[in-house]
Amino acid sequence: MVQRLKQHGFTACIAGAIMFLSSLPYLIAAVSTPSGHVYTWMLHNIDDSAVYLSWMKQVAQGQFFQENRFCIEPQKSVLFNIWFLTLGVLSKVIGGPLAYHVGRLVGVGGLVFAIARLAQSIFKDTKHQRLALLFTCLVSGFGYLFGGFSAARGFTGQPIDLFQPEISVFQVSVYSPLFAPALALIVVAVTSWINAESSHATKHAIVAGIATALLGNIHSYDVLHVMLSVLCIRVTNDVIQRRFHSRAWLLAIGAGVIALPTTAWVFYATRVDPLFAARADTDTRTAALHWVLIGFGIALPLAIVAVTNAIKARDLPKLYLAAWFIGALLSSQLPFAFQRKMLMGAQIPLAMLAMAGLLHVATKLKGDFPKILIGTAVLLALPTNVLWVQDAMSKLPANAGSTQMRPYLTTSENDALAWLGRNGKANDAVLVGPDPTSHLRFPGVALMPHLSVYIPAIAGVTVFDGHWSETINYGAKITSTVRFFDASTTDDVRREILVQNRIRYVLYPNKLADGPLADGTGAALLKSDGSPQYIPVRWSNGTLTSQTASPAYPVNPLGMKRVFSSRDVEIFEVVN
């Protein structure tokens, strides 16, 4: 009992340390907030973080089934997410950003305890369990040897640890409130199945099934990873023991039956909601195998040492880890557009095996050399995690995160979003004007409507041109956005864009907070005073511009009236 309490205490300390370290980038970003700005409490992949906040916002508004408010197309909402329902209810009490990070930290804690439970199932020695837990929480790949992420090399031409946080426990801990709990469920499911293989106890198979069912609701892609891994473990047991375990196969089938309903429901959603099906089919192919393996870093060669020893010793728990890793790799090669998403969790069994291999090598050394060896291995495993965080932090002075979206909004931009939240309805479509200075923050990305992702996340209404993956036909919609705001476009064409897309509000960057126009392409979007070319200026004091034509003509030819005005943003309502 005392030993168990000590072990739980150690795990809690590791969980607390990971929680703190994973929160540090956000805290630094918060205290670095520029004057006149508001921090969004997002940093990595703000695009997807905004999607999660949108789901939470919908729950706070009383919505049970999820809607994709980054799309204006009709949709049949049949999906719900238990985790984000919980966070959405919490957000109604404490606000979206705080609930977002509470969810992230709870997920991190659950993940660390799940990894500790796995270590206890693999290693008998308490010290070895602790080392395995530490190494698994810290390990990353060899991406740092390639100089960091390169947009030019894309997502298939460089080590995966540079752009896939799913394959690093630490990066998952920093990333979002979705990945950590999903990864924790993967670990719980497979660990429970490993325990079921060892004991043939029904209770472990039931836990594996329940964890997989929850995973199917929260992050359904990963169910394929779990099921293939369980299948590989099951086959490994029969091959090593040279017998067909009918009871174990029945337990596996039973666990699958328990897990099936939630995944079947998601599949049903793809049949009845073409919009969801198109979004789920976003092309995220797995990188070439050598980039995948390099992305696992030093853990891979050390794991090979462990597997070699496990085969000789017929050490089934460690061979189960190898089977798990093979199942994860196989799932990432299935003929689906979302291949690489299924690599999440593959680093867990590999890191456990790596520590086993490291301990084996260490036993052959004397004196301080075992400690030096283990310390060196940990140091070699850390740099990509550090580089990943440093890369995002280095972009903060330019008001950019890991993508081109802005971590900081000006106070008037935040006020505009608050106005939309108070006055707009959930299905009101908002057309967001392009930012002609976006390329200054994120080279190579010009004329991005940087406020668009925040419309569903903060205001809780629908956006026309919002998200590269969630918005159907995103490229065509960005083209329509630029065309609408181009000074050479006729009012007839603009009116057609408004009517065809049922636009209710147009959000226009009145005075861009990041400086005057510097882009030759974007210069045509504005008059010299920064106001829209196509809306007559009634008066201007250099900071605030009123664009409601004249007292005798309160609505401009496009059927829009100004309903909100601030230093940086104008909002126009389409009234006819």
Which sequence ranges carry the predicted segments?
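Transmembrane catalytic cores of multi-pass membrane glycosyltransferases
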Residues: 48, 211, 215-316, 336-338
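Hydrophobic/aromatic-rich transmembrane helices and adjacent perimembrane loops
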Residues: 108, 224-226, 338-366, 372-377
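Extracytoplasmic
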Residues: 367, 372, 376, 380-576
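Transmembrane alpha-helix segments characteristic
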Residues: 204-212, 250-257, 311-334, 353, ...
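Membrane-interface transmembrane helices that cradle and orient dolichyl/undecaprenyl
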Residues: 181-204, 309-313
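Membrane-helix boundary/interfacial segments in multi-pass membrane proteins
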Residues: 28-48, 163-177, 267-296, 317, ...
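Active-site lumenal/periplasmic loops and adjacent helix-entry segments of GT-C-fold
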Residues: 20-187, 220-224, 395, 402-407, ...
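Membrane-interface alpha helices of multi-pass inner-membrane proteins
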Residues: 171, 190-192, 204-220, 231, ...
